[in-house]
Amino acid sequence: MKIAVEIFPTDQTINPVEFARTAEGLGFESIWFPEHSHIPTSRTTPWGGNVGAPPLPEFYRRTFDPFVALGACAAATTTIKLATGICLVAQRDPIHTAKEVASVDALSNGRFLFGIGYGWNKEIGRASCRERV
């Protein structure tokens, strides 16, 4: 069985490199880091899209860029797979994203897993769609 572990790496959590080394040492198959680069100042979508959810936790605003964090982890580990869980592709420039994906994959010797998605925050999705159309 392959088991993975995910955290929201921020300046207030365990260092991503320390996390990756520990997970690798414990035999986990992969680590997954999310992406939350755009937090609207005015949000009506409840956290996680769930009606009645509490306010958005502060760590969302402090989340490290997954490609930078995973690149650091790639340099510090040898076997654990490194993944985005998830990369919000609709919010990103496709050329920069392709370069970042290729870079982390090359620096990790093919250990990168590219998890993608759209996310749950409707305000972000609306803005991204307007900008790209």
Positions of PLM-derived features:
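Generic, ordered loop/turn and secondary-structure boundary motif
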Residues: H38, V68, C87-A90, N121
